Regions:
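N-terminal secretory signal peptides
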Residues: 1-4
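A short beta-strand-to-alpha-helix junction
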Residues: 41-42, 83-86, 124-129, 225-228, ...
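Active-site neighborhoods of enzymes that stabilize oxyanions during catalysis
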Residues: 289-401
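Metal-dependent active-site segment of extracytoplasmic phospho-/sulfohydrolases and closely related
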Residues: 47-48, 66, 229-271, 341, ...
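N-terminal export signals
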Residues: 7-28
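Active-site His/acidic residue clusters
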Residues: 43, 152-171, 185-236, 268
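Active-site nucleophile/metal-coordination loop of metallo-enzymes that catalyze phosphate/sulfate
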Residues: 38-43, 56-141, 156-159
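C-terminal segment of N-terminal export signals and the immediately downstream linker at the start
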Residues: 23-44
């Protein structure tokens, strides 16, 4: 049988990676350049840096001195969160589209595909069904954009959106991501070769090593080292930008896509086994597991759907470790969000379709992993210095913020621009 990504992550161990930085792909030229709604400053470069899986409490001067300094010298948003489901793909989609999953088509990492009759990862370019700031800045403002994304499935989902796209390489076996060292080196090369005006970056080490950290419930040895390593590499990026005269042009928007939670080996929920044991709903639901959340898609006759869903709520809601049950409409997930969503308590995880499907200790997707760091820094004169903002912000707010900086219309987005961070 084919290993799931979470099963594979559990067996990754220590991996040595070596090789070249990789290749950069060019998107097709923009067919038309529209006039921006306001002039775009010639000296503005925007970088959206996603520190994948970083928790708000890790943004401190001991673990992440560079990021903490950037935040202290810029504007920090103290009440920032992901959108549900708190996974990588839906929150990266939210960042660049500015709209909720029901509008962009990406409610989770994994969904139940009725056509295929199985669960699958949303890693195809046509899975993303909304415009992004990567393509809009390219086509409406006539400026170069770039994506430098460490994870293979992110590169797949955003294929063709940016003017310049780095294909992550070398990929670490099992994790399907490129280490932050290679990603930052690729970013520096992309800046040197193409001078993009807006760049979308994912740094995956904190997330990947956090997933596998067997000491996650206590010392977090691997996770803490990953935070330190990533932070140092971002210091290296800053020195590069300063030495090339680009720091004064830079607006740096830094945030995570979700947090991270750790569970003991036996604190797992296997909903598939409970469904199989119940004659009323056996074979009636497909499950897409997303670590801290499961989505359930109804497979039976239409006239029995309501009764089956009521029984599913009873069965799943009674399982130890289950926190909440949602109608997907409550979370604005859209049709791919299935017919029911279950989340787990902190310190638990889902493991479906079998108890062996998700052995990794670090997971996210559930409510406790919604909190994220979020700040705006950089050397550009428009960045407000030394401020904090306590109004709620979400990953959705990145796209309208970027759109506002480049003079693009954002009235139709669900997010709100983080204008408190700028002198505009």
């Amino acid at each position: 049988p084919t290993l799931t990504r979470r099963e594979a992550l559990a067996g990754a161990g220590v991996v040595a990676a070596a090789g070249a930085v990789g290749v950069t792909l060019l998107a097709d030229p923009a067919p038309v350049w529209a006039t921006p709604t306001r002039p775009v400053a010639d000296d503005l470069d925007v970088y959206v840096l996603v520190t994948d899986g970083m928790r708000p409490d890790e943004l401190n001067p001991v673990q992440a001195p560079t990021l903490h300094r950037w935040a202290s010298e810029g504007t920090r948003f103290t009440d920032a969160s992901s959108v549900m489901i708190a996974e990588t793909l839906p929150n990266h989609a939210a960042m660049v589209t500015g709209v909720l999953p029901e509008r962009n088509g990406v409610p989770a990492n994994s969904i139940w595909d009725h056509g295929a009759g199985t669960d699958r990862t949303l890693d195809r370019p046509d899975d993303l069904r909304a415009p992004t700031v990567l393509d809009r800045i390219r086509t409406e403002a006539g400026l170069t954009t770039a994506s430098v994304l460490s994870k293979d499935y992110l590169h797949g989902l955003f294929g063709g959106r940016a003017s310049v796209q780095w294909a992550p390489f070398p990929l670490v076996p099992i994790t399907d991501h490129s280490l932050d060292w290679f990603t930052i080196e690729a970013l520096k090369q992309t800046i040197t070769d193409h001078a993009p005006r807006m760049t979308f970056v994912n740094l995956g080490d904190m997330d990947r090593f956090g997933h596998m950290d067997l000491s996650g419930t206590s010392l977090r040895l691997a996770r803490n080292q990953a935070v330190a390593n990533s932070d140092h590499k971002l210091w290296d990026l800053e020195q590069f930008l300063r030495s090339t005269g680009r720091w004064e042009r830079s607006v740096v928007i830094v945030l995570a896509d979700h947090g991270m939670d750790w569970s003991e080996p036996l604190r797992l929920i296997s909903a598939a086994g409970a469904i199989e044991a119940d004659a009323a709903i056996r074979g009636r639901f497909g499950i897409a597991q997303n670590g801290g959340a499961d989505t359930f898609a109804y497979l039976g006759p239409a006239h029995e759907r309501d009764a089956s869903l009521r029984r599913l709520r009873e069965v799943v809601g009674a399982l130890p470790g289950v926190n909440r049950l949602y109608d997907p409409a409550e979370l604005s997930l859209g049709r791919l969000g299935g017919d029911l969503v279950a989340t787990c308590h902190p310190g638990w995880r889902f493991s479906d379709p079998t108890p062996f499907s998700n052995p990794i200790p670090g997971n996210h997707g559930h409510e406790v992993t919604l909190g994220i760091p979020f700040f705006v820094g950089g050397g550009h004169r428009i960045v407000r210095r030394g401020g904090t903002v306590d109004r709620p912000v979400r990953t959705l707010d990145v796209a309208p913020t970027v759109a506002r900086l480049f003079g693009l219309d954002h009235a139709g987005m669900d997010g709100r621009p983080a204008l408190e961070a700028f002198h505009l």
